[in-house]
Amino acid sequence: MSLTDVLELNKTELFAKIRNGLPVVQRTQNLLDCKDDLLFAWHAKDSCLLVRNWRSSLAAKVNIQFQTLIPSSLVSLEVDRVLASNEGSLVALSGPRGVVIMELPRRWGPDGYYKDGKPVITCRTFGLDTQLFLKNPHLEVRQVRWHPHSVSDSTLLVLLNNNTIRVYNHSKLRHVWQVGPPVLRSGANNSLCDFGELAVDFDIAPAAKPRVTEPETAGNNETTLDKSNKTLVAAKSLPKQERIEWPMVVLRENGNIYILMTGVDSENTRLQGPVTITPQAHDNYGLESCALMIIPSLPPTIVIAESNGKLHHALLMEAEATEHSFNEVDDSVLIEPAEYVVHVLETVELELGISAPATGKEGGNCPIYLKRDLINELRYFAYHNAGLHAVTVSFIAELQRYLESESDEDRLELAVSASAEYILCTKFDSSETVNAVFGLALLQIPAGIVLLLGSGQVISLKLVIDAQLLVTPNENKPVDSEVSQQESGPPFVDTIKSLLQRSVNQPILADKLSSPSAQESFELLNQAIEVLREQYLKRHDLVRAAFTRHINQIQLKKEQQLQEIQDLEQERELISERAHKLAERFEEISYNQELLVRKCNALMQRANASLPNSVIAEREFSQEVIRLNKVTQSLAAGLETAKKTFNKQRYHIAQSQEDLKKNAYELPEKQHRTITEILTQLTGEIDRQITDVKRINKIVGI
């Protein structure tokens, strides 16, 4: 099993067929998508959708390699994006010149394929506003998203380059929402493109309750609705129940952010902006903005991507008061004061390719596409012409912990910055050749990713769901160790790990479309040598210096501790000698004290006995005590003698019993039985005689 293809998808017939029909133009697109256990792949050559159950295909025996879903109508557009709906009932096939929706058939069978694994299935398809794109050759699709809260799982939002979002329900156009000034490809309106006023991306934030608008603003809204002939519809659609709006965050090319407030299926919209971005920056956080994504945290997190590789992480928060914005380029679009503000917390700069430092060239600019990880909300993926990055937004976990904390003294500290891991690199030289990412699909349970490159190579990797779930040796430390760690400083192992921590990632290098030239190989070698020198050898020198300092400190402490041990040994010997002398002195003093006590008692007795006023009873009592003492001593001596005699006799008795046991004569069994019977008869005879004697005595009266 290859380390870069754990699912062994390169050997499958599906990707062998995809490899033969890849697009010629090398630009980043997404021809892959995954919904539950089904992997969708667009075959550009045959204009059909290939489906494979990647989870069941992990088994040893696979009956069905893949299924082919043929559109019922001809798909003439160049598909660059495959997007399955939330419930997996529809698939949107999007390209620069149109959008096609394909209805997926029902699933049944042991492996969960469509129509019990039928190899080829014709699916109903319908194009969206085909005539609109034919009549407007400059019209292009910028973004396509399924509404996450559509009841029928069929609401599709399409952003066009004329600053409009078209809302479709299956094949029917429901609404057209204006998110900017109308764009015409003639006259002075071309300046909109120059000033970056075109919307490039949008995403849907979590639902919010509509605010109560001011009377003046309400009057202006009514006037605008009258112009659009929507007053009656708005009056009829005012239910008494509480309304819910979905903020749609729209990103323009110049970095300005607008918010379109509307319902899931509502004709009434409120465009707000440009939203104030804090802290202020001279480039407005992106003069070359190309992508936007919202992570549904609390508050929502906005990710803004620039084509130069910068990613801005910000929070979308409600403003304390509505902020009035400047007049729009076109007065035909009514823009309300913004109810939100965007606060940028950090900026992450991606490495767009690996190039040799000697060339002085960077990865250059290329569009960046964002894809959110549905399993881990702290992580998302950024893919581009130079490969794939996995970005972890750490402050979301801090926000969640702070919101869940019940302590009033808990403070919010967003000290941990985001981390960007370069997973796959497809550009590692200064040439203009590009091996773009043609598809990215995220797998669930087990978590993984599948990438399709322009060279036809398929990369399949397993992912850790959450890095915080990994057990580290630093976890489950006792409380006492924290105090000792504060006194002694960080562990030396952690210090070495921090010194060996590289500032750049070493991604997987993808295969090139052709064999590299000598110049490209030389650049790659120089880059590898530079990375080895800067990120490995230099850090090893730092580690060696740290080891030298640590060894010197340990030797110094060792010498000091040995000297202290010698001093303590001397002190111990002195203390032992003193303790021995004190013990002898104590025993001597105790013995002398006991003698003195005895002498004092004897003197007291003599003094009491020799007193002239001593009564006769006391003298007699003292004499009796002396006599009893002598008698007691004689009795004790006699008792001791009796004990010795008793022990001696018991010993002789035991010896005699052992001798009797040894010299005992055992009768034969027959004789023993005969004697036993005779004794039994004699016992019975004696009992009868005793009974007769008692009877006679009773008669006689004795």
UniProtKB/Swiss-Prot annotation:
Q: What processes in GO biological process is this protein linked to?
A: antimicrobial humoral response; mRNA export from nucleus; negative regulation of protein export from nucleus; protein import into nucleus; ribosomal large subunit export from nucleus; ribosomal small subunit export from nucleus
State the encoding gene. Answer: mbo
The protein's job, in short, is: Essential component of nuclear pore complex. Required for the anchoring of Nup214 and emb on the nuclear envelope and thereby attenuates nuclear export signal (NES)-mediated nuclear export. Together with Nup214, required for the nuclear import of the Rel family transcription factors dorsal (dl) and Dorsal-related immunity factor (Dif) and the activation of an immune response.
Kindly list any coiled-coil regions of this protein: 542-594
SUBUNIT field: Component of the nuclear pore complex. Interacts with Nup214 and emb to attenuate emb-mediated protein export. Interacts with tamo for nuclear import of target proteins including dl, msl-1, Ran and Ran-like.
Q: What is the protein's given name?
A: Nuclear pore complex protein Nup88
Q: Which residues carry this modification: Phosphoserine?
A: S191, S228
Q: Which PANTHER family does the UniProt record give?
A: NUCLEAR PORE COMPLEX PROTEIN NUP88, NUCLEOPORIN NUP84-RELATED
Q: Tell me which residues bear Phosphothreonine.
A: T231
Q: Name one GO cellular component term.
A: nuclear envelope
Q: Does the entry annotate any disulfide bonds, and if so which pairs?
A: none
